[in-house]
Amino acid sequence: TVLMVQVENEIGFLGADRDYSVPAEEAFAKPVPQKLNSEFAGISWEQLYQETAPEMFMAWHYACAVEEIASAGKEEYPLPMYVNAWLNQFPDRPGNYPSGGPIARNLSIWRIAAESIDIFAPDIYLSDFDGVCREYTAGGAPLLIPEARRDAVTASNVFPAFAIYHTLGFSPFGIEDFRADKEEEELSATDQEVLEKLQIDELAFVYNGTGRFLARSYELMDSMKKIYFQYRGTDSMHGYLQKNEHEKGTILRLAGCELELSYRKHSLSEPGCAGMIIEDSEESFFIAGCNTDIRLLPRRGSGQKHLTVLSMEEGSFENGQWRRGRMLNGDERYHKRLGSVPEILRFRYKAER
């Protein structure tokens, strides 16, 4: 079954900010197309876009070419279509990354010129996973992550991608090579040299036992499909992730309590600190994720004096129904946490006023 079509992969111009061939120079000398600039007739690319003119020029022409392909394809079979983007990063000069591709600052041009493209999808190898997702979902745009890092942090990024940004799909690069029992691998000297020239984080392409963690993340998400779609996009669903090593935690305001989530120290060979929370009632929630210490607190300003955890359960979803495993008590309930291997817990609590 074909679900959607990738029209182009990381399209753009490498090595320079734009095409300087004779035909390209002639096109660049012409005014900006009226479709892009209805307010100032006859204005040049440089007058309108100044120093970013070369990249905007390339973005327009790449997007027009993609639109020709996509619109013709949809006439034959109207499937959803997407284009994925090689993202800009330091030193952030067009040509170091593919100039004119659908990076965030070019999307306004792409959306005008390539109306048949349904999704502009970021390939996220950068460490700022949250920032990229936020840019690509601006204005309610749908998110698809066709390529992501290969290291273990990708297994934790799954949860905020679905919980916060409602991604339609998530796949690390080369997922067909991932196995739960696959050993860690190192990059060759040639690979390291190429990544260095392209200013790409070497760790993003290092497989460090990711398979067993990612398999568990996918297993949890698959088992939670029913409850996920029930609460997707509502105030009862929350997500979180540690954005950098200086961030110690976060506090989420739930319906009946505040949830203090402290980020645990972890090695580079483990997933990061991230998770998803689904409130199935005012005094009950599920939390799935990794490397997080959990503390339930009274809601400030609510008049709550004390909060009691009634139960803390391990378990799993089977056919959409929660099947309780162990009921945790004693030290396990006192030290509430998610470990390095993705897991799910259910909490029931009672607030006293």
Predicted regions and their residues:
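C-terminal beta-sandwich/jelly-roll accessory domains of carbohydrate-active enzymes
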Residues: 256-276, 282-353
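A generic short-segment signal for beta-strand/edge and adjacent turn/coil regions
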Residues: 50-52, 88-91, 113-114, 139-140, ...
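Polysaccharide-binding and catalytic clefts of secreted carbohydrate-active enzymes
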Residues: 1-107
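Short, solvent-exposed loop/turn segments at secondary-structure junctions
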Residues: 9-12, 87-90, 126-127, 150-151, ...
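Short, surface-exposed linear patches
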Residues: 26-30, 35-36, 142-143, 166-167, ...
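Short linear motifs at secondary-structure transitions and domain/linker junctions
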Residues: 57-59, 94-99, 119-122, 249-255, ...
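Aromatic- and carboxylate-lined catalytic core of secreted/periplasmic carbohydrate-active enzymes
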Residues: 160-295
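Catalytic-core region of carbohydrate-active enzymes that cleave or remodel glycosidic bonds
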Residues: 68-78, 106-212
